[in-house]
């Protein structure tokens, strides 16, 4: 799947009538380096500056900066999006983190349920490890 996304990014990069946006933020920089136009990245709701900087570094082919910023994106992915045991862990982790940051509620529509206090504590710890000062609510 990853190779298909990258191939399409490269194949469509010069087509002015087509925009290629990737969803998985873990591959946004690589896709932009190959011609994609950007990403639809959930983590940008938490850390907009990080994702804009990563996009700009990829657009400018600043590989040192891409590597530095990509490490942070991968840390977010590995710590916030993996709490829980179900496929919904990405969404629930994101919503929980946004709630802890005071951005929005951690409400998720049925059939999902928001994280319990134990999982919220793990998200809080992940945010602390990312250097974010948050109050556990």
Predicted stretch roles:
Residues 11-21:
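Short beta-strand/loop segments at the ligand-binding rim of alpha/beta enzyme cores
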Residues 14, 26-137:
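Structured C-terminal cap/extension of enzyme domains
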């Amino acid at each position: 799947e990853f190779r298909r996304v990258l191939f399409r990014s490269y194949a469509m990069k010069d087509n002015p009538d087509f925009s290629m946006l990737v969803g998985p933020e873990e591959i946004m920089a690589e896709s932009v380096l190959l011609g994609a136009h950007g990403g639809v990245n959930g983590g940008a709701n938490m850390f907009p500056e990080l994702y804009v900087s990563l996009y700009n570094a990829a657009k400018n082919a600043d590989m040192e900066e891409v590597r530095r910023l990509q490490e942070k994106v991968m840390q977010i992915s590995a710590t916030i999006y993996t709490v829980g045991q179900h496929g919904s862990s990405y969404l629930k982790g994101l919503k929980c983190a946004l709630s802890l940051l005071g951005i929005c509620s951690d409400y998720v529509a049925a059939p999902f349920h928001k994280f319990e206090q134990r999982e919220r504590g793990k998200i809080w710890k992940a945010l602390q490890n990312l250097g974010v000062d948050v109050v556990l609510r």
